[in-house]
């Protein structure tokens, strides 16, 4: 490939007031990252890649088909950080040496930036759902029950795209680990969003939801808590178990899925929507974990601890019945047809967002598992007339991951670079002059393999 003229640093396009607040938040020292690929045992620091945020237009929300766009990834990283600042995060080893970070993360300055932008950022990140989901038409408890049964049967009948991609991968172990990382988003802080819907007074449905919550927390026994048994599964794969160790590898779809339940739980005007969403989620979890057990046993045999999956394959059948009968249908019966559209919308949105999780994870697995082919595709890609973006790296450069809205060709202009696309798989070494096509929406990071490394990012115009 011919090296095109070098571009100046990307102009700031973050947009108006929202963009300025986002850049101020992401530019805080807590969120600038370090040179390590895996984050340390500090829940307050996570890489928000402030340099790439400046390229995103936060005046242009992603449409229904743009959930994997870079600005969607950036928005959901921010939202996830905002939401977690409303929970209690303490490192397992204690706060010694981290008191200052604790104070900064929960302190007034970042809190004011969050509170001044969270509603606008939610509209930016989730506004596309209004366009993508239509719940017009008859809205009765009977319609609600029939629609719910239909989508649950649909989910149970079809194989998981992500688990299918794992089973078909050349490097199935790395693919399986990538999937575990996406589950860790919720698995290590499980039921945190649900906890925001437990206060108040709303009758037997409140008690039914609390039954599920206390199950997730092991009825007060820490060793039985679902986050504890999820960590056992990670340890059996020799993976880190602290919160957000693999922050750099969370994909836009899984981030959006996790954030969606916080989004609904933060605004109690959306309570009935939450009730629909959580009922759908609980109903489809059990068959999904049955499929996961089959795939993971086929790869790892008895070397992987699947207690977490066994537990969910069993308990979520029970939770599915509770939420369907004692939450979803009970709320519709008690409060009448007027709440049914919101219950329906919650089911439909949860189904859609869950599809983002599956499709994004499957696409990342397929791409990262077939990088030699994307070396070949780089050679035939037609890049645009715009000068490429130049990225210079040294051993001290902070490591972060990002994606692009459209396809780009990554070319090594100086030195050598390691392309990192999975949390545990080997990186793809690119020598001077070599190139690789990165499809739009695919997550990657670059590590220098020589004292000084420079890469060029050539945009590929849509066909």
Where are these regions (language model features)?
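Non-heme di-metal
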Residues: 2-394, 399-413, 418-462
């Amino acid at each position: 490939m011919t090296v095109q003229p070098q571009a100046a640093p990307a102009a700031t396009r973050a947009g108006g007031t929202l963009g300025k607040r986002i850049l101020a938040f992401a530019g805080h020292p807590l969120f600038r990252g370090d040179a390590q690929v895996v984050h340390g045992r500090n829940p307050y620091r996570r890489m928000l890649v402030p340099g790439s945020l400046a390229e995103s237009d936060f005046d242009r929300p992603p449409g229904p088909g743009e959930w994997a766009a870079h600005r969607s990834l950036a928005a959901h990283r921010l939202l996830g950080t905002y939401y977690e600042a409303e929970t209690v995060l303490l490192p397992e080893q204690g706060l010694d040496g981290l008191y200052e970070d604790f104070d900064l993360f929960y302190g007034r300055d970042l809190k004011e930036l969050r509170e001044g932008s969270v509603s606008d950022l939610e509209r930016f990140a989730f506004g596309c759902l209004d366009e993508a989901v239509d719940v017009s038409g008859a809205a009765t408890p009977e319609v609600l029950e029939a629609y719910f049964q239909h989508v649950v049967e649909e989910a149970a009948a079809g194989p998981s795209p992500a688990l299918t991609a794992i089973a078909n991968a050349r490097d199935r172990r790395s693919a399986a680990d990538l999937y575990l990382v996406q589950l860790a988003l919720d698995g290590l802080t499980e039921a945190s969003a649900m906890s925001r819907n437990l206060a108040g007074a709303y009758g037997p449905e409140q008690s039914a939801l609390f039954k599920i919550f206390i199950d997730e927390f092991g009825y007060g026994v820490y060793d039985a808590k679902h986050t504890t048994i999820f960590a056992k599964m990670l340890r059996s794969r020799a993976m880190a178990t602290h919160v957000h160790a693999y922050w750099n590898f969370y994909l836009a779809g899984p981030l959006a899925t996790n954030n969606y339940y916080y989004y609904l739980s933060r605004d109690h005007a959306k309570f009935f929507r939450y009730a629909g969403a959580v009922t759908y989620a609980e109903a489809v979890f059990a068959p999904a974990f049955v499929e996961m057990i089959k795939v993971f046993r086929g790869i790892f045999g008895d070397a992987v601890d699947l207690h977490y999956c066994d537990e969910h394959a069993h308990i979520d059948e029970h939770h599915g019945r509770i939420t369907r009968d004692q939450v979803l249908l009970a709320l519709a019966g008690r409060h009448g047809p007027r709440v049914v559209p919101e219950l329906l919308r919650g089911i439909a949105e949860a189904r859609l967002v869950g599809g983002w999780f599956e499709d994004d994870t499957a696409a990342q697995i397929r791409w990262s598992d077939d990088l030699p082919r994307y070396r070949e595709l780089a050679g035939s890609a037609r890049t645009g007339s715009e000068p490429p973006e130049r990225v210079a790296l040294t051993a001290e450069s902070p490591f972060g991951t990002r994606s692009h809205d459209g396809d780009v060709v990554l070319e090594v202009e100086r030195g050598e670079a390691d392309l990192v696309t999975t949390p545990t798989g080997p990186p793809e070494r690119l020598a001077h002059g070599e190139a690789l096509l990165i499809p739009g929406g695919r997550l990657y990071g670059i590590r220098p393999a020589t004292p000084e490394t420079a890469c060029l990012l050539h945009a590929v115009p849509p066909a």
